[in-house]
């Protein structure tokens, strides 16, 4: 699989008005299966995307890997009494809507998240994401797009992974892009997903992108920040859609999802 690096500069963006609010089952246990992010480095993933409550300035992980907040991210402000999960680069709340205020990366993993102590977690670099998705042994057999009970996203499987009996997966990416392309590639039931989770599978929902007060590309694309700057105004993110995965340079004031890891 070839990794593309490009800039998102002026593409037409479709506004999707559906939201997927987090439900409230008990949180899943932390994921423990290791993923290689370099030849000599492994990590384990948090069990859900990072979420922030601005008014109380508290953090937590989504209760389930498939959870994402959606359009209510548009209310992102220091006085918002609700949860958000699309962050500006290395920050929660910028002083205004320009990338000039976001000159320093502050790793979300250094924060106190739920009951975890400071510095428990960290953010992957662009090189680590590239190695995990494209360069580790059998990488093309450890990645897939899918729709899980109507939630589109990217599946990642741990090192030395074996598929559970009775589940026949299609690895890789769809032949075309679009919201429906995920399900057309493959659809998983909640029972199948629970089986995959038990084997250490990670799911990154296609949680979209926040630009100022607009939320776009929900269930079309996933945008996940890396710890890597590109230049003074842009930083690198992992971007996937149904038919490809890329590392993109995007404006630091865009709101994107965050999935943290800890060293294994």
Stretch-by-stretch model annotation:
Residues 11-14, 254:
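Processing junctions and N-termini across compartments
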């Amino acid at each position: 699989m070839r990794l593309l690096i490009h800039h998102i500069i002026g593409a037409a963006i479709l506004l999707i008005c559906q939201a997927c609010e987090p439900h409230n089952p008990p949180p899943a246990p932390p994921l423990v299966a290791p993923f290689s992010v370099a030849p000599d480095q492994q990590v384990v993933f948090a069990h859900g995307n990072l979420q922030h409550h601005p008014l109380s300035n508290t953090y937590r992980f989504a209760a389930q890997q498939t959870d994402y907040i959606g359009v209510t991210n548009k209310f992102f402000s220091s006085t918002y009494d609700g949860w958000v999960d699309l962050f500006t680069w290395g920050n929660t709340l910028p002083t205004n809507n320009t990338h000039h205020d976001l000159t320093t990366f502050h790793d979300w993993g250094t924060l106190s998240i739920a009951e975890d102590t400071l510095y428990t977690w960290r953010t992957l670099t662009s090189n680590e994401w590239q190695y995990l998705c494209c360069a580790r042994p059998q990488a093309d057999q450890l990645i897939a797009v899918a729709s899980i009970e109507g939630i589109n996203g990217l599946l990642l499987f741990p090192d030395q992974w074996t598929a559970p009996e009775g589940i026949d997966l299609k690895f890789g990416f769809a032949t075309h892009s679009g919201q429906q392309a995920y399900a057309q590639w493959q659809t998983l039931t909640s029972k199948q997903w629970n089986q995959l989770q038990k084997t250490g599978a990670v799911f990154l929902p296609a949680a979209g992108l926040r630009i100022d007060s607009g939320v776009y590309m929900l269930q079309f694309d996933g945008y996940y920040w890396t710890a890597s700057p590109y230049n003074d105004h842009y930083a690198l993110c992992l971007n996937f859609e149904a038919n490809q995965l890329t590392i993109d340079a995007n404006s630091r004031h865009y709101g994107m999802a965050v999935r943290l890891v800890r060293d294994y």
